[in-house]
């Protein structure tokens, strides 16, 4: 029985190390410049609203593209101008912080993330938790074959609020639709011979 328990512990530790997103060390100034900043994969970073110093740090990090999920307002236009001047590609695709995103919005963001010419990509909203958490959750389900529960757990770890019921519902709905679609496209089993 003890051997079985130690195997479970070893498997759990392995899963945490392999599946956990990379957390890059940050001092207080870096945290202020790039709040809630984390590496999701070699091609994708996530976080909150970067300052001008944060944009410079993204360039140093090798990021090529910023996808801003916040409103298209003066702040976004200033960020876009600053990002482009720093040599970054910039896209502002506003998502509501209070409503479910549409499938079209999600597809548009994922297409930007997946385009090789844009990678690595930094996706952000204000805090890097709710809208960004939803996008990253869908990315995880699509690219890393995560379940909705795994994706929501990571999103909650990075701050997806308990009040964000619509965002969490979207993650669950997306997963259900993904499963239904994969079941429809799966080849039928040949009839069994008797």
Give each language-model segment a name.
Residues 1-6:
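N-terminal secretory signal peptides that target proteins for export/translocation
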Residues 8, 14-122, 134-194:
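Cys-dependent protein tyrosine phosphatase-like superfamily
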Residues 125:
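Short cysteine clusters
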Residues 128:
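Substrate/cofactor-recognition hotspot
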Residues 131:
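Conserved lysine of the Walker
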């Amino acid at each position: 029985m003890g051997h079985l328990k130690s195997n479970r512990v070893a498997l759990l530790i392995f899963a945490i190390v392999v599946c956990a997103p990379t957390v890059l060390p940050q001092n207080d100034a870096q945290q202020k410049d790039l709040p809630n900043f984390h590496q999701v994969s070699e091609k994708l970073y996530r976080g909150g609203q970067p300052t001008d110093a944060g944009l410079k740090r993204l360039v140093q990090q090798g990021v090529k593209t910023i996808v801003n999920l916040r409103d298209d307002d003066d702040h976004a236009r200033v960020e876009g101008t600053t990002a482009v001047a720093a040599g970054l590609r910039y896209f502002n695709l506003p998502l509501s912080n209070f409503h479910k995103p549409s499938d079209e919005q999600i597809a548009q963001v994922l297409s930007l993330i997946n385009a090789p010419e844009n990678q690595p990509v930094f996706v952000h909203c204000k805090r890097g938790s709710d809208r960004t958490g939803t996008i990253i959750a869908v990315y995880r389900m699509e690219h890393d074959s995560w379940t909705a529960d795994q994706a929501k757990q990571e999103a909650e770890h990075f701050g997806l609020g308990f009040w964000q019921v619509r965002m969490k519902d979207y993650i669950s709905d997306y997963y259900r639709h993904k499963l239904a679609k994969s079941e429809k496209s799966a080849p039928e089993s040949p009839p069994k011979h008797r």
